[in-house]
Design a protein with these regions (language model features):
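C-terminal active-site rim and adjoining tail of enzyme catalytic domains
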Residues: 131, 138-170
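Non-catalytic positions within long, well-ordered alpha-helices that form the structural scaffold/packing
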Residues: 11-12, 91-92, 144-148
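Conserved anion-binding
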Residues: 5, 13-94
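Conserved, mostly hydrophobic/aromatic
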Residues: 18, 32, 90, 102, ...
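Alpha-helix-loop-beta-strand connector modules within alpha/beta enzyme cores
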Residues: 1, 34-44, 66-70, 115-138
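Hydrophobic faces of well-ordered beta-strands that scaffold small-molecule active sites
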Residues: 18-20, 74-79, 99-101, 137-140, ...
Length: 188
């Protein structure tokens, strides 16, 4: 679970978007909100002050401290049956910008397979919670054509790096060959 220290460090380093996994209760949603926002909405401390560094934020009209509450994005992930049961109340917590229908983990934690009618009903619960709270609804990029989904997870950074490396080095790939020189060369 993401804690106050992790959120504080991310924000102090300049993060503008905080994504918190496995939010199951209103209390957890309020805690995440409190750690993300300065008073009066939250209880974020000034911490080490890294985010207030003039080199990083000196050109922000009004300064970082006075403007960040209006610019930070807080996304809470609904991944379990408990989170699903509390989705409407979680989405209604002031300061929550969006809820994320965590497609894979909802399937993992509930036992329903993506595409099954019961699975789709779960996604509709998250959908309705976001729409009724007038916040954004997030999901995987594959859902970009679903109604009302407006922010997306494009995939893992590992997969993106692997694709990039494959494109860059693809012509060099020859996994069947044996090295002829060097420490991995086959010895006669």
């Amino acid at each position: 679970y993401t804690d106050e220290r992790e959120i504080q460090h991310a924000l102090d380093a300049g993060a503008l978007v905080i994504v918190v996994p496995t939010i199951d209760t209103v209390e957890e949603a309020i805690a995440a909100r409190n750690w993300t926002y300065f008073p009066p909405l939250g209880r974020r401390s000034n911490g080490g002050g890294q985010a207030f560094d003039a080199a990083m934020w000196g050109n922000v009209p009004g300064g970082y401290r006075n403007t960040i509450n209006d610019n930070v994005v807080l996304i809470l992930m609904i991944e379990t049956l408990e989170g699903l049961q509390n989705a409407a109340a979680i989405a209604a917590v002031p300061g929550v910008t969006a809820i994320f229908a965590a497609s894979g983990d909802l399937a993992n934690f509930t036992g329903y397979r993506q595409g099954d009618p019961d699975y789709e009903r779960m996604i509709n619960v998250v959908h309705d919670a976001a729409i009724n709270a007038n916040i954004r609804l997030c999901g995987p990029l594959a859902w970009r054509d679903r109604p009302d989904f407006t922010c997306f997870q494009a995939g893992s950074e590992t997969a993106a790096i692997t694709r990039g490396v494959s494109l860059e080095l693809g012509e060099l790939a020859n996994t069947q060959a044996s090295p002829e020189v060097g420490p991995f060369a086959l010895q006669p």
